[in-house]
Amino acid sequence: MSLNLRDLEYFYQLSKLRSFTNVAKHFRVSQPTISYAIKRLETYYDCDLFYKDSSHQVVDLTPEGELLAMRTNEILSELNHTKKAIHRSSMKDFKVGFPPIISSYLLSKQDNLNFFNALHMIYGGSNELLSLLLNEEIDSSLLGSLEKIKHPQLEIEELFQKEFFIIMSDSHPLANEKELGFKDLLNEDFILLGEHNIHFNAFNRLNEKYNQSANVVLKLDDAHTIKELVRKNLGISLMADIRLSEDFKNLVKVPFIEEDKQFFHINYAYQKNSILSESEKNFLEILKTLK
């Protein structure tokens, strides 16, 4: 006797809904269809999978049923993942997550943008994109983090790191310092990138060491505007070197002392058991050339 995948689908849904009637409605089949499927599985595994009452309504899973439900969930999830992977491999373009800060840096480093025609670029914060990737709504993603990322579901390659600096006007009293500790900045006014940004997380990590003593006067999502305000000496900021490649006239960047140094990690992530298409492999090779 062979095992029928459809029977497993019926069984798994029954393990969740606990009602033959509701499962039949879910699949738009007759109730006897579900009943016969369960009987076939019980014959195949030579055990009862459910405790049933006299009206043939499911009361609960037997221990064997609990075990099969857990394994069936894994099997169906893997089959669904495989189906998506095969579908993705046949697509000419692929969905890649791009945090705006990383995409700006990446695009500024390219001499030819023709390759990007093969990309379906999905913009969002790193946390949002990570969620999309884990739910298989995108194929891969660039991700920013304050440390190396590890996840059992993902293959993650760290591409490079960029140091965080204190950014200030070249006329600021501290502009000529070779390095500064965060405690030296507690009386300064900070103008920062918003709370959903890795930069704000880096600032918070330092600020927590000093009981949130630093003064934040403004949070914006536009790095260019922040630089303009800092240039006018209306405050200072904290930015990773990835943000400092241009528009730096009349600004200085001062490194943190060793114990306060923070780093922006730029990563590329995709499903661990996925097979990369030629386009994806080429894209990864381009990413590996960046620093």
From Swiss-Prot:
InterPro entries: HTH-type_LysR_regulators, LysR_subst-bd, Tscrpt_reg_HTH_LysR, WH-like_DNA-bd_sf, WH_DNA-bd_sf. One of its GO terms (cellular component) is cytosol. It is found in: Cytoplasm. Residues 20-39 bind DNA. It comes from the Bacteria. Its main location: cytoplasm. Keywords: Activator, Cytoplasm, DNA-binding, Transcription, Transcription regulation. GO terms for molecular function: DNA binding; DNA-binding transcription factor activity. Pfam families: HTH_1 (PF00126), LysR_substrate (PF03466). Residues 1-60 form the HTH lysR-type domain. Belongs to the LysR transcriptional regulatory family. Required for malolactic fermentation. It is most probably a transcriptional activator. This is Malolactic fermentation system transcriptional activator. It comes from Lactococcus lactis subsp. lactis (strain IL1403). The gene is mleR.
